[in-house]
């Protein structure tokens, strides 16, 4: 990576956690990712979810159809795990290069997760098959029991689900997605080479005070929810350390404005347009720009056993204002940091 005073040149990054939705929303949001990233792990939580090879092939084609000419972008598809999923279907998709990984959503943990897994025991034959064939498991790491406080769901998941699972299936490759707590940062750092994590820009930049003090900011509301400052600091320190099993995963999750600015608003930040510059700002603030390229472009491919991208992009350090909104067919999208002045942006 070369870093003259105002330009960062890095190998083209990948996004290891992305929601593209479907239909008109998909057509609107895909270009914001495809112009910057070489690849992205695409989440399968559509309605209905992506649970078959055929559904994944069709969804992949809809994504590719939305990629503008001149963008070199490869969507990496995932399978949505359910209690009733056939392990043979999962293995077929993996062997045919359709499924890159499989996603475990605890039932009702987040958007469109009502079909999710009721317990790890219910899908143990599937997980055993994944361990056998070397297929990565992507985990939304929260318990969803009604009696557990929303701010404690990730920490409880580690002790009650994640650690027992990894003790039982010691060769299974696991990505602990969008980690938000010191508990998770410590757990991944202290784990072995088969455990990795992604972190979003919002969890590095903000904590729950930013979302709740002085008024509720619905466009910072996502799941897992922003935590207190000590957790934010632990995440920042983890990425700034150069730890090589944590990598870029935006969890960009678009919802129309009326679904966010509501009496019962949806969870998710549409950060695809601003995420890379946001990460750069955090690394700069932590005096860790020497580790920025690895986080964005190297650590993820290494964990997945994929080649790094062979093209490069540049970020420029000059103040720019983020758009207030982005047009949808019959509504608008509010991007992460809408209307704010940002320090780093991708050079056009």
UniProtKB/Swiss-Prot annotation:
GO terms for biological process, alphabetical: 'de novo' pyrimidine nucleobase biosynthetic process; 'de novo' UMP biosynthetic process
Cofactor remark: Binds 2 Zn(2+) ions per subunit.
Modified residue annotations for N6-carboxylysine: 103
Active site positions, chain numbering: 251
Residues that bind Zn(2+) 2: 103, 140, 178
Enzyme's top EC category: hydrolase
Gene3D superfamilies: Metal-dependent hydrolases (3.20.20.140)
Pfam family membership, one: Amidohydro_1
Keywords: Hydrolase, Metal-binding, Pyrimidine biosynthesis, Zinc
Pathway noted in the entry: Pyrimidine metabolism; UMP biosynthesis via de novo pathway; (S)-dihydroorotate from bicarbonate: step 3/3
InterPro entries for this protein: Amidohydro-rel (IPR006680), DHOdimr (IPR004721), Dihydroorotase_CS (IPR002195), Metal_Hydrolase (IPR032466)
GO CC term, one of those recorded: cytosol
Catalysed reactions, as listed in the record: (S)-dihydroorotate + H2O = N-carbamoyl-L-aspartate + H(+)
Cofactor requirement: Zn(2+)
Transmembrane segment boundaries: none
One Gene Ontology MF term: zinc ion binding
Binding site for substrate: 19-21, 45, 140, 223, 255, 267
Entries under PROSITE patterns matching the protein: DIHYDROOROTASE_1, DIHYDROOROTASE_2
HAMAP family: PyrC_classII
Function as written in the Swiss-Prot or TrEMBL entry: Catalyzes the reversible cyclization of carbamoyl aspartate to dihydroorotate.
PANTHER family: DIHYDROOROTASE
Subunit structure: Homodimer.
Annotated family: Belongs to the metallo-dependent hydrolases superfamily. DHOase family. Class II DHOase subfamily.
Protein name (database record): Dihydroorotase
Gene for this chain: pyrC
